[in-house]
Amino acid sequence: MSELLQRVTALARAAKAASRAVALSSTATRDQALRAAAQALRAAEPAILAANAQDLAAAQAKGLTAAMTDRLRLDHGRLEAIAVACEDVAKLTDPVGEVTEAWDRPNGLKIIRRRVPIGLVAIIFESRPNVTVDAAALCLKSGNACILRGGSEALHTNLALAQAFAAGLAAAGLPTEAVTLLPFTDREAVPALGSLRGIVDIIVPRGGPGLIEAVVNSAKVPVIKHDAGICHVYVHAAADLAMAEAIIVNAKCQRPSACNAAETLLVDAAVAASFLPIVGRAMATQQTEIRGCPRTCALIPTASPATEADFRTEHLALVLNVKVVTSLAEAVTHIETCGSHHSDAIITADETVARSFLAQIDSACVYWNASTRFTDGGEFGFGAEVGISTDRLHARGPMGIRELTTWKFEVVGTGQIRG
């Protein structure tokens, strides 16, 4: 066993032991810890922002993209939002112990299906430091412990955030090992975590294709993927074009570095001549580059030709792919071929067409007359989120506290034996 694997295993074993205490703790205790963590984050703001400045300086020296730098950056407002998110999670209804089904058998057995924590959740993520606290808060609320491995570009920020959160755990009398951040970012830590079958119960990777592939290929424990967000907005022939303009500007430009930002706009040929010039002007105002099909380039002189690779790329920047399609069927085929099954939207006043789109698009979240930017645990009413799963098993879409539970069956008898 390598020295790194030994270190990771020791930290994971301690977190696993702490998971037992968290699972058996009361709702009041976990909520107290969350509120105390929020206050500790506020009190530690100078230290956290100083650590973040250190990471930002290193990121700029390394030449990280604007999108990556934006994901990394913290300021007073973003840190306050992180603290408020902890308090919001504390206000959520505790899923642990919830009875989801109950029934009586003819032989008199009473069977109950009850929600219980998963155990130890490993979360591997890249530059966005708010994930450190969001993940810790959701795991704690749902009765789990977590072991976190962040990206090297955010190490100092993540350590400062984790230290503040640990103060909240201690204030409530919970073991600080219940939220464990690996204090190193060696690449070998990823397969090391994934090898700990029997200690780590699930792994949730959040990041780019390289990270996702590395985790999936090496893990010996179950993986729930937070995959790429190649999201689409399809403007149908029966769309309200003013609504469509507002939605595409929001979906693309509000926060282009987010995984739920739109990457591709599909426009029905019937409205292309009237709508695409509107799109061109709106994107110019937002300083957004358009990469389009030949018809798009003819209608938007500032657009540059799109490649096939563009339509399969999560830009995470102010770049919008645009393609003219001739039918709903062509739009669906494009999304199913080039998309990532994350979030896709149709803009139309035709309910029949909308219902067909919602049924045919095999994505975690599908929208009718709304921005893809709503794919978010907070916007769905889940509180913060651990990730947005594009898988089909156990969890799909924003992963809130219920998605961090499993269940067990309680069977109550009066002496029954099986014949």
What are these regions (language model features)?
Residues L5, S127, D134-A145, A160, ...:
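ALDH superfamily catalytic-core signature
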Residues M1-K110:
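N-terminal Rossmann-like NAD(P)+-binding subdomain of aldehyde/semialdehyde dehydrogenases
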Residues A18-L24, L265-V267, A317-T326, H341-I346:
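Short, well-ordered beta-strand elements within core beta-sheets of diverse protein domains
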Residues Q32, I278, L328, T333-R418:
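C-terminal core of ALDH-fold dehydrogenases
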Residues S25-T29, V96, A172-V179, Q254-A261, ...:
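Flexible, glycine/charged-enriched surface loops at secondary-structure junctions
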Residues Y234-A238, L265-A269, V325, I347-A349, ...:
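Short beta-strand-to-turn element immediately C-terminal to the catalytic PLP-Schiff-base lysine
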Residues K91, T100-A242:
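Rossmann-like NAD(P) dinucleotide-binding subdomain of oxidoreductase/dehydrogenase enzymes
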